[in-house]
Amino acid sequence: MSRTRTSVSKSIHRRAVLGGMAAAGAFSVAGPYVARAQQGDINIGVLLPFTGSQGAYGPDMRKAAELTTKIVNDAGGIMGGRKFRLFFEDDESSPTAGLAATKKLLEVNKCVAVIGIWGSPIAMAIKPVLVNANTCMMVSGAANAITDGDTKGLVWRFQAKATDWGPAMAQAMLSRGWKTVSILAQQNAFVIPMIEPAKKTFAAGGAKVLDTVIYNPDQPSYRAEVQRIFGANPAPEAVMCLGLLTDFVSIVREEVRMGATSKIMALSIMADAEGKFIEAVGPDVAEGIEHFQPAPPLGTPSYRKFLKLMGATDDNALYLFAGNTHDQICTLALAMEKAKSTDSLVYTKEIPAVDNPPGEEVDDIIVALDKVRAGVKINFQGAGSICDFDARGDQLNRHFGHFRIEKGKQKLVQIIKGPTG
């Protein structure tokens, strides 16, 4: 079965290198990046999903962290020759497993930062432990609560926060001319904060929200929810789907089975997921589904340099999350170098000084380190984002990508600008 949608011109091709969960087998799930510890090594924990519902994202994030660390270490490291040593742990897409892994990184591996941290539930579970241990955490999770409360300045989000996703996604749907929409969303701390801001944007843009249905994760079936949303009379012109890959595969199969006519815009973590969605349902079923996500700085010198680092063979290759671990390693190196310290309470104070404007824009980590050592004020430009932060550690100036699946490929429709402050 297939859908017919309007074509767009610019193609984002899926890269072949280390794609999806299959690449997890190329690495041990946990272990040090450097075979032997040298005196003065700086231990960094990297907590990522390699298994479970979020496992598609771990391998490329690991690869980016390793390659970026190699660049820093091969150039002599930081603070007079100290090298980063990475310890990887699989959070299994589970807060319980993520918490156990974090404790190991702190207590056994003596890590001075924990980075990666893809899922919001995992981030929220480990946050109290890391903050209590006075250890920096750098996350890709979007739930607003991750940076709430007294974080001691230790929590840094390399991602747009959830309340910024909803309005931007609604704006993309309004740009398609849809006047009636419904929302089908998973019950979790990442998704729920998106809904009300999205509704306000729909209302301001003249679109009517017909219905909102919240479902639980890992339900055996989503038939009742799909029937209520897609089978309504009148049916919405489009449905905003907010959740994860595994539930979306079931939802799409169900709406195709019932012959639904409503268009779909989903989160890219549902409808892209490093190519896993198309693999699961096939290109015909996926045809025309639109999706939306905070995007890396596509087309910039920093992103082109990152594509080369990752071994991408196409200038339009799309990495939604791998750039985050690249940027986290770079930010740690720059902040520690500037602070001349590996104490999280000390070096995290220097993150705005190396990442935020004003300053000379630099996208090369070795050049950036040299300038920091020379006392030059820099504004580091990352591969996952331009790395600007507010006082709470939330990311600013993050843009969003609106994509459409056509003939088994992800095509960029437009870039939506996010909040600037």
For each feature predicted by the language model, list its residue ranges:
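Extracytosolic ligand-binding ectodomains
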Residues: S2-R5, H13-G20, A30-G421
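Flexible coil/turn residues that form the inter-helical turn or adjacent wing/linker of helix-turn-helix
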Residues: K10
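Sec-dependent signal peptide hydrophobic core
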Residues: M21-G25
